[in-house]
Amino acid sequence: MIHEDLFAGFDPAMVAAAARQRAADVKETRRAVAQKSANRHHMRRANAEATLAEILPARFADGESWHVATRGDIDALSYVRHILAGVSHLDHLLMSTWCIAKNDLTEISAWLDAGKIEQFDLYAGEIFPGSYGDEYEQMLSMCEAYGARLIVAKNHSKITLASNASEAYYLTVESSANVNTNPRIEQSTIHASRNLHAFYLEFFDGIKSIDKHSKTH
């Protein structure tokens, strides 16, 4: 129960409108809803990956941030699929994740083959070589075949950087979700900001791999 004193000084019409919107959101939790605020932040909810195309723009305007709360089959790679649908290609894709599945690496390989991605860098957690042996070997093969880079570190961050310099398009996805799909509730924010992209890129460029086999890639 929200105490009425919290809204003292606010326009009653705005408070009533917000309350109606909140009631509608609670009632229809299984349907994607949207709300736009004045500072160019956008909020979305999604229950399945197919919903992303309905609730997110094909391209993100510079300076916008889109906040997405999910409780379905959406992971970090879901956003990459959506981003790729709105550009000719990506010069660079960097993904930082605790873990990644074989089918995800296979899909990324197909994008590299098709020229949809020129350079792919994967930052994985220290468990990756030992606990995900097949995926680790697959990624090493991608390093040889495509010039991809694997950096193994004490990493638990979930960041995706995507860029197309010729289109001055720089995106950063901050997320709780790993690359591999799971049914858990996750939250993500997509930022169209060259400065934020550069901030994270500089940070990740400074990380050295602790894995002897991936150091040379």
Predicted regions located by residue number:
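Conserved beta-strand termini and adjacent loop/short-helix elements that scaffold enzyme active sites
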Residues: R71, Y123-G125, I151-A153
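A generic structural signal for short, solvent-exposed coil/turn residues
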Residues: F60, A85-V87, A114, L140-M142, ...
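Generic alpha-helical structural element
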Residues: A69-G72, T97, T189
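Primarily the HKD phosphodiesterase
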Residues: A76-A145
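N-terminal localization/anchoring segments of enzymes in phospholipid and broader phosphate metabolism
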Residues: M1-L90, D113-G115, E202
